[in-house]
C-alpha cells in the first residue's frame, strides 16, 4: 500500500446489492466531490458487511519496467520499524513493504517446513526503471544496515520473487 495505495483508494466506482435487494451504484467520473459521504470507500472498507459488490471500476497501474523483491531480518521489531519510518520519511517510492514478527516466522517455519531465521523480517518490493529500482534498493539496504538489518536476500525473477513473498502470504 506504500506506492499504489490501499484497495479502497484504487476503487473508483461500485455496483452494490444491499441486504434488502436494492441495487445502487457509487462513484463517478469526477475525482473529488463534496456531495456527502464517499460511499465507494465506505462499502470497500466494510469488506462485504454492508452489501454485495457485483461490479467495480478500478484504477489501473502500468506494469513497471523492473521489479525486485527482498527480505531482510532484524534483531528486534523496533529496528525493523525504524527502517520503515526512515524509508518513508526519505520519500523512497517503495512498492510494498511488510513486517512479519518473529512469532509468525516461527509458526511459518513449523507449519510450512521452512527454515527462516526466527526474528522479525521486512518483506520489500521495488518497482520502476532498472536504474531507479537499483537506487531504491541500495538506499533501503543502507538504511536497514544502520538498524542492524541483515543482508538483503534478493530476486528480480518472477518465480523467485513469488518464492520470497511466499512466507509473508502464508502468515
Question: Which residues are covered by each model-predicted region?
Answer:
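C-terminal substrate-recognition/cap domain of FAD-linked oxidoreductases
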Residues: 58-62, 68, 72-76, 81-171
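FAD-binding subdomain of flavoenzyme oxidoreductases
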Residues: 1-98
